[in-house]
Curated annotation (Swiss-Prot):
The lineage of its organism: Bacteria, Pseudomonadati, Verrucomicrobiota, Opitutia, Opitutales. Part of the 50S ribosomal subunit. This protein is one of the early assembly proteins of the 50S ribosomal subunit, although it is not seen to bind rRNA by itself. It is important during the early stages of 50S assembly. The keyword Ribonucleoprotein applies. The gene is rplM. This is Large ribosomal subunit protein uL13.
Amino acid sequence: MKTFLAKKETVQPKWYLIDAAGVPLGRLAVKAANIIRGRHKATYTPTVDTGDYVIVINAAKVALTGKKEEQNEYMFFSGFVGGESRRKVSLMRERHPEFIIEHAVKGMLPKNRIAAKMLTKLRVFGGETHTHEANNPVKVTV
């Protein structure tokens, strides 16, 4: 029996919905990254983007264990001398709750050219509503 390799033309992506309210960030990010990569399918091929779309709602209510809310920081660098800035998770949760999940999922994707394309399949919303009702997403429990 020959090994099956998926083709880009034959992939039929689906849409999945994940509710982040009260779910630990790491568990949520692993689940989302595996769906985006296509690891949950029998037709998974590492060199082809076989993944599905993921919609994450309630990003502002994602759970962080321990003291990560006060201790963890996100570092940004402008490229200029003295252009480094750091922001705590609590501040990012107030201003951009989507960034926390996007950053975690991005870290769990492979570091190659396909990862940038895979990351476009992640849609994160801070509240309970989203704009992709027409795609009939399947609800996934984490």
